[in-house]
Regions:
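Short acidic (Asp/Glu) and glycine-rich catalytic loops that position anionic groups and cofactors
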Residues: 98, 188-189
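C-terminal cap/loop subdomain of S1 sulfatases and analogous C-terminal strand-loop tails that border
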Residues: 68-74, 113-116, 121-188
Length: 189
Protein backbone atom coordinates (compact mmCIF):
# COMPACT_ATOMS: atom_id res chain seq x y z
CA UNK A 1 0.00 0.00 0.00
CA UNK A 2 1.16 3.52 -0.71
CA UNK A 3 -0.87 4.98 2.17
CA UNK A 4 1.32 7.32 4.20
CA UNK A 5 4.00 7.38 1.51
CA UNK A 6 5.12 10.56 -0.26
CA UNK A 7 2.57 11.66 -2.90
CA UNK A 8 5.13 11.19 -5.67
CA UNK A 9 4.86 7.43 -5.19
CA UNK A 10 1.13 7.44 -5.82
CA UNK A 11 1.61 9.73 -8.81
CA UNK A 12 4.21 7.33 -10.17
CA UNK A 13 1.90 4.38 -9.56
CA UNK A 14 -0.76 6.05 -11.72
CA UNK A 15 1.32 5.11 -14.77
CA UNK A 16 3.67 2.39 -13.55
CA UNK A 17 1.65 0.18 -11.19
CA UNK A 18 0.27 -3.29 -11.78
CA UNK A 19 -3.15 -1.76 -12.39
CA UNK A 20 -1.73 0.31 -15.26
CA UNK A 21 -1.18 -2.80 -17.38
CA UNK A 22 -3.36 -5.67 -18.53
CA UNK A 23 -2.58 -9.21 -17.45
CA UNK A 24 -1.21 -9.91 -20.93
CA UNK A 25 1.07 -6.86 -20.73
CA UNK A 26 2.28 -7.99 -17.30
CA UNK A 27 3.01 -11.46 -18.60
CA UNK A 28 5.09 -9.91 -21.36
CA UNK A 29 6.93 -7.53 -18.98
CA UNK A 30 7.78 -10.35 -16.60
CA UNK A 31 8.86 -12.63 -19.45
CA UNK A 32 11.08 -9.89 -20.89
CA UNK A 33 12.64 -9.22 -17.48
CA UNK A 34 13.48 -12.88 -16.90
CA UNK A 35 14.53 -13.21 -20.53
CA UNK A 36 17.09 -10.44 -20.05
CA UNK A 37 18.23 -12.03 -16.80
CA UNK A 38 18.71 -15.40 -18.52
CA UNK A 39 20.53 -13.73 -21.43
CA UNK A 40 22.97 -11.97 -19.10
CA UNK A 41 23.58 -15.23 -17.23
CA UNK A 42 24.21 -17.02 -20.53
CA UNK A 43 26.62 -14.34 -21.80
CA UNK A 44 28.58 -14.32 -18.53
CA UNK A 45 28.82 -18.09 -18.89
CA UNK A 46 30.26 -17.62 -22.38
CA UNK A 47 32.89 -15.21 -21.04
CA UNK A 48 33.80 -17.67 -18.28
CA UNK A 49 34.02 -20.51 -20.83
CA UNK A 50 36.41 -18.54 -23.05
CA UNK A 51 38.57 -17.62 -20.03
CA UNK A 52 38.63 -21.32 -19.09
CA UNK A 53 39.51 -22.35 -22.68
CA UNK A 54 42.33 -19.79 -22.80
CA UNK A 55 43.68 -21.09 -19.51
CA UNK A 56 43.34 -17.72 -17.77
CA UNK A 57 40.32 -18.34 -15.56
CA UNK A 58 42.47 -19.05 -12.50
CA UNK A 59 44.19 -15.68 -13.02
CA UNK A 60 41.05 -13.66 -13.77
CA UNK A 61 39.08 -11.58 -11.28
CA UNK A 62 35.38 -11.63 -12.05
CA UNK A 63 32.89 -8.98 -10.94
CA UNK A 64 29.16 -9.00 -11.45
CA UNK A 65 27.22 -5.98 -10.27
CA UNK A 66 24.27 -3.80 -11.16
CA UNK A 67 23.49 -0.12 -10.84
CA UNK A 68 19.89 -0.70 -9.72
CA UNK A 69 17.23 -3.33 -9.31
CA UNK A 70 13.74 -3.58 -10.73
CA UNK A 71 10.26 -3.80 -9.25
CA UNK A 72 8.67 -6.12 -11.85
CA UNK A 73 5.51 -6.28 -9.76
CA UNK A 74 6.97 -5.90 -6.27
CA UNK A 75 4.97 -3.36 -4.28
CA UNK A 76 2.54 -3.52 -7.22
CA UNK A 77 4.97 -1.39 -9.23
CA UNK A 78 7.04 -1.66 -12.37
CA UNK A 79 10.39 -0.19 -13.44
CA UNK A 80 12.74 1.65 -11.03
CA UNK A 81 10.83 4.66 -9.84
CA UNK A 82 11.12 7.16 -7.01
CA UNK A 83 10.93 4.74 -4.15
CA UNK A 84 13.94 3.86 -2.01
CA UNK A 85 13.01 0.19 -1.62
CA UNK A 86 15.55 -2.63 -1.31
CA UNK A 87 14.20 -4.07 -4.59
CA UNK A 88 15.93 -1.17 -6.32
CA UNK A 89 18.93 -0.41 -4.08
CA UNK A 90 20.04 -3.73 -2.58
CA UNK A 91 21.67 -5.09 -5.73
CA UNK A 92 24.25 -7.81 -6.38
CA UNK A 93 27.96 -7.09 -6.17
CA UNK A 94 29.53 -10.46 -6.78
CA UNK A 95 33.31 -10.75 -6.78
CA UNK A 96 35.60 -13.70 -7.33
CA UNK A 97 39.29 -12.99 -7.00
CA UNK A 98 41.46 -16.08 -7.62
CA UNK A 99 43.65 -16.94 -4.67
CA UNK A 100 41.86 -14.36 -2.54
CA UNK A 101 38.08 -14.88 -2.40
CA UNK A 102 37.02 -17.35 0.25
CA UNK A 103 33.68 -16.03 1.46
CA UNK A 104 30.34 -16.88 -0.07
CA UNK A 105 28.59 -13.79 1.23
CA UNK A 106 29.22 -10.54 3.06
CA UNK A 107 26.64 -8.26 4.59
CA UNK A 108 28.99 -5.27 4.46
CA UNK A 109 27.68 -2.11 2.84
CA UNK A 110 29.48 -2.02 -0.51
CA UNK A 111 28.90 0.18 -3.52
CA UNK A 112 29.88 0.51 -7.16
CA UNK A 113 32.25 3.25 -6.01
CA UNK A 114 34.30 0.45 -4.41
CA UNK A 115 35.02 -1.25 -7.73
CA UNK A 116 37.87 1.03 -8.96
CA UNK A 117 39.76 0.75 -5.65
CA UNK A 118 39.27 -3.02 -5.72
CA UNK A 119 40.71 -3.32 -9.22
CA UNK A 120 43.68 -1.14 -8.24
CA UNK A 121 44.24 -3.30 -5.15
CA UNK A 122 44.22 -6.51 -7.19
CA UNK A 123 46.71 -4.94 -9.61
CA UNK A 124 48.98 -3.99 -6.70
CA UNK A 125 48.49 -0.28 -7.32
CA UNK A 126 47.86 2.57 -4.90
CA UNK A 127 44.18 2.49 -3.89
CA UNK A 128 44.42 6.04 -2.53
CA UNK A 129 44.16 7.18 -6.16
CA UNK A 130 40.44 6.58 -5.67
CA UNK A 131 39.02 9.14 -3.26
CA UNK A 132 35.53 7.79 -2.61
CA UNK A 133 35.60 4.00 -2.77
CA UNK A 134 37.47 1.32 -0.83
CA UNK A 135 38.81 -2.04 -1.91
CA UNK A 136 36.60 -5.01 -1.05
CA UNK A 137 39.50 -7.48 -1.40
CA UNK A 138 39.72 -8.10 2.37
CA UNK A 139 35.94 -8.55 2.56
CA UNK A 140 36.17 -11.33 -0.03
CA UNK A 141 38.67 -13.04 2.26
CA UNK A 142 36.09 -12.98 5.03
CA UNK A 143 38.08 -10.50 7.08
CA UNK A 144 36.59 -7.78 9.24
CA UNK A 145 37.79 -4.51 7.78
CA UNK A 146 38.54 -1.85 10.37
CA UNK A 147 36.60 1.34 9.78
CA UNK A 148 34.36 -0.16 7.09
CA UNK A 149 31.28 1.95 6.49
CA UNK A 150 28.38 1.48 8.88
CA UNK A 151 25.92 3.10 6.50
CA UNK A 152 25.36 3.71 2.83
CA UNK A 153 24.04 6.68 0.90
CA UNK A 154 21.97 6.27 -2.27
CA UNK A 155 20.64 8.89 -4.65
CA UNK A 156 17.80 9.14 -7.16
CA UNK A 157 17.96 11.82 -9.82
CA UNK A 158 14.66 11.43 -11.60
CA UNK A 159 13.28 8.88 -14.00
CA UNK A 160 10.24 9.79 -16.09
CA UNK A 161 9.93 13.04 -14.12
CA UNK A 162 12.29 15.34 -12.24
CA UNK A 163 12.65 14.28 -8.62
CA UNK A 164 15.63 14.24 -6.33
CA UNK A 165 15.88 11.79 -3.43
CA UNK A 166 18.59 10.77 -1.00
CA UNK A 167 18.69 7.79 1.30
CA UNK A 168 20.87 7.09 4.32
CA UNK A 169 20.64 3.47 5.42
CA UNK A 170 22.15 1.73 8.41
CA UNK A 171 21.45 -1.78 9.67
CA UNK A 172 18.71 -0.41 11.93
CA UNK A 173 17.26 2.62 10.15
CA UNK A 174 16.54 4.02 6.73
CA UNK A 175 16.04 7.75 6.21
CA UNK A 176 14.74 8.93 2.85
CA UNK A 177 14.94 12.64 2.10
CA UNK A 178 12.36 13.88 -0.38
CA UNK A 179 13.14 17.61 -0.75
CA UNK A 180 9.86 18.30 -2.55
CA UNK A 181 7.65 16.20 -0.29
CA UNK A 182 7.52 14.39 3.05
CA UNK A 183 10.58 12.55 4.33
CA UNK A 184 10.50 8.91 5.41
CA UNK A 185 12.11 7.19 8.40
CA UNK A 186 11.94 3.42 8.77
CA UNK A 187 12.93 1.32 11.78
CA UNK A 188 14.42 -1.84 10.22
CA UNK A 189 14.94 -3.69 13.51
Amino acid sequence: SLIGKPPIQENYATYWSTSSFTNEQWKKLIAVYWGYTAMIDFEIGRIMDVARELGILDDTAVFFCADHGEFTGSHRLNDKGPMMYDDIYNVPFIAHIPGVSTVGRSDAFVSLIDLPATVLDIAGLDTSLVEDGRSIVDLTRGEDVEGWREDIVCEFHGHHFPLQQRMLRTRDFKLVINPESINELYDLR
